[in-house]
Amino acid sequence: MAEANPRRGKMRFRRNAASFPGNLHLVLVLRPTSFLQRTFTDIGFWFSQEDFMLKLPVVMLSSVSDLLTYIDDKQLTPELGGTLQYCHSEWIIFRNAIENFALTVKEMAQMLQSFGTELAETELPDDIPSIEEILAIRAERYHLLKNDITAVTKEGKILLTNLEVPDTEGAVSSRLECHRQISGDWQTINKLLTQVHDMETAFDGFWEKHQLKMEQYLQLWKFEQDFQQLVTEVEFLLNQQAELADVTGTIAQVKQKIKKLENLDENSQELLSKAQFVILHGHKLAANHHYALDLICQRCNELRYLSDILVNEIKAKRIQLSRTFKMHKLLQQARQCCDEGECLLANQEIDKFQSKEDAQKALQDIENFLEMALPFINYEPETLQYEFDVILSPELKVQMKTIQLKLENIRSIFENQQAGFRNLADKHVRPIQFVVPTPENLVTSGTPFFSSKQGKKTWRQNQSNLKIEVVPDCQEKRSSGPSSSLDNGNSLDVLKNHVLNELIQTERVYVRELYTVLLGYRAEMDNPEMFDLMPPLLRNKKDILFGNMAEIYEFHNDIFLSSLENCAHAPERVGPCFLERKDDFQMYAKYCQNKPRSETIWRKYSECAFFQECQRKLKHRLRLDSYLLKPVQRITKYQLLLKELLKYSKDCEGSALLKKALDAMLDLLKSVNDSMHQIAINGYIGNLNELGKMIMQGGFSVWIGHKKGATKMKDLARFKPMQRHLFLYEKAIVFCKRRVESGEGSDRYPSYSFKHCWKMDEVGITEYVKGDNRKFEIWYGEKEEVYIVQASNVDVKMTWLKEIRNILLKQQELLTVKKRKQQDQLTERDKFQISLQQNDEKQQGAFISTEETELEHTSTVVEVCEAIASVQAEANTVWTEASQSAEISEEPAEWSSNYFYPTYDENEEENRPLMRPVSEMALLY
């Protein structure tokens, strides 16, 4: 190392020591050749010797030749006295080329990685032209990248070639010397070329797989497009076929439908050929190991299934129309047969039957007619019913019965004539007389053969002459009385069957609508593909939005619908069908109770894209909220249909059970309605279910009446009635205030703020209040609290009073039974002592009552005491008679479970005597 300036040499030395990869063992210092520089170097090195004093020796060399003592000349360049051929500028050029090539390889790797990521993560479009365009663009980019890889490979090979030393005779020794220098660079370039080759191989493999997948994706979309088009066309033909479902009508209309069906069959053949081609194409894709193998097989099966349905439906429709045409043809031929028979009867004149030859000719004509009409006459109605039951409409059945009766009557007439003509041919004594059936036979015939604008003709035999008598229309009407009643009965059966059919058909539609809602909306809320269209807060609201609709669907689809279908030909089974499953209908109460919460969710999220997309897929004209209302509408529809069915089933088999079913459904509706009101009660501390069954509920106008004890000034100043909603339970009566929010988006269901609750064992009533016959009193305890209640009408008032009386009666009966058990446990002595004590109390109570009340109330008190004494025998009778006497006298009547008061006037309320509790008075009897 040569350096004129020692300090700079020292700095360079330190840098080399820090960056040298190995350990330093010896430092050689070459001094400058000029005198001054050598002198300065020696002085500077002397003063800075301590800086160079390291843990290794430092040798100061005087000349270049001294280097050969320490270093081989093959390791030194010519300027240092060595033989090593080295060009620093050439080394810099090669070094820059190597570094640039390495950077190019790195950038190429990044480009390939970026392109692969783009191919893997880019979402493909949903239309075929866009897919083809993307496939072309990616193929072009692939070829550009391939060209870049080829250019980089070529550059690396050129650089690798330049690093190799030419193999000449004069340069053999120098090549060996340079081999060690260029071997490291050559290995670097070779390693980079290997890396480029591996990247190219991996990229080609990736592109081959991606191109195959893209081609298969394009094939799948073309297959799916053909599939959807065929499905649409098949469904269109199925809809056209369904329009031919009504096989009734005239024979001309049936012919027209058969012609339309033939045209439809021709169109279907071409469509089925296309479907077969698409199915074969799908099988070919599956055989080529398509990545969507399961989907393609599923589509092929669906297309094959739809094709089979189309073929079977057309085949079944052809058979049905052919049978209908055959039926119409039979009816037409039977009518012609009847017409020919009528003409034959009408053309047989009396004077032609006076000889044997004429009689034989007439007999032959009759035999020919009967032989021709024999197939129609011998056609049994049961056979017709069995053969054409599916296509027989009520009109066709009526026509068939009419023609059948005509044929039977014609046969009867001709058989009688045959017998007469045969007798005439055997006897040659007296002239032939025309033989006709007796009037009794004509009366029993169901349908007359000859009709006239003025009346109908019947045949009679008067002595030896034959006459035609025209029966007036009035006589015909009188004679048709029994048949009209029969027609009335038949019409009731038709109406009953119509209602039953409506019940079954609407049940099928209802089940199908529930299925579409559960599948098209509820199930889609769990579909990850729809999460982007759904607000995050809506995803966990499925059970609130749909309630227990799935439970309702399973009940109707698995159980109730099949039970109703079994009643299609047996209307008497409808009642038991509802009664056996009335407990299952309680699930509707749960659904209705959840309905307010469901509507709140719907109002909040009704405009989100999820519901709109589901509605679009289902092709529903109505939004989801209309279908969420279907269970509520259905449970109210049952009682209407049962009413109609009961209306047409009077005095029929199963009408009693049908009435019970109707009552059960009405009770269910009332229970559901009551439960809806109960869940709207706010502020009640406790469990409302502990109050027993809700009997009634309704709104009333309420005034605070006079109370015993202190009265607040605000109660005295209240003239305007309070609006209260009363809930009557088995064990209590609850007072609430009805609240209805107003404004857009508010809940349309009312809520009830709890005010107070009275236990029924402390409640009493006064049935009549002067001033308005709609008012009555409800009071608590010893009239500590009194409310005057006004109903909307008298009927509502009487209904409430009746239910309250029933509750009080039941409590009185329970109390009586309890007292009786206690009395049975007492001894005779105890009974005697209690009896004496109670008699004393009774006399004392009567004395006090006499002093505090007027004489006009005494009789009422005695009647009440007597009623209490006999309550164990006939409790209901006592209460009923007391109620009736109160209604007749139009005086206030009071009822309580613990205390009884005599009749009173409003001005004498404070002076009313207080009677003993029932628990004490019941022991007097």
Swiss-Prot record:
Protein keywords: Cytoplasm, Guanine-nucleotide releasing factor, Membrane, Phosphoprotein, Proto-oncogene
Repeat positions for Spectrin: 221-322
PH domain sequence ranges? 687-809
Cleavable signal peptide: none
Which residue range or ranges hold the DH domain? 495-675
Pinpoint the CRAL-TRIO domain residues: 1-88
> Can you supply a Gene Ontology BP term from the record?
dendrite development
CC per GO annotation: cytoplasm; cytoskeleton; cytosol; membrane
Q: What cystine pairs are annotated?
A: none
User: Which tissues is this chain's protein expressed in?
Assistant: Isoform 1 is expressed only in brain. Isoform 3 is expressed in heart, kidney, spleen, liver and testis. Isoform 4 is expressed in brain, heart, kidney, testis, placenta, stomach and peripheral blood. The protein is detectable in brain, heart, kidney, intestine, muscle, lung and testis.
One Gene Ontology term of the molecular function aspect: guanyl-nucleotide exchange factor activity
- Disorder cited: MCF2 and DBL represent two activated versions of the same proto-oncogene.
Family designation: Belongs to the MCF2 family.
Role played: Guanine nucleotide exchange factor (GEF) that modulates the Rho family of GTPases. Promotes the conversion of some member of the Rho family GTPase from the GDP-bound to the GTP-bound form. Isoform 1 exhibits no activity toward RHOA, RAC1 or CDC42. Isoform 2 exhibits decreased GEF activity toward CDC42. Isoform 3 exhibits a weak but significant activity toward RAC1 and CDC42. Isoform 4 exhibits significant activity toward RHOA and CDC42. The truncated DBL oncogene is active toward RHOA, RAC1 and CDC42.
Q: What is known of its domains?
A: The CRAL-TRIO domain is involved in interaction with inositol phospholipids. The DH domain is essential for transforming activity and directly catalyzes GDP-GTP exchange activity. It may interact with CCPG1.
Q: What is this protein called?
A: Proto-oncogene DBL
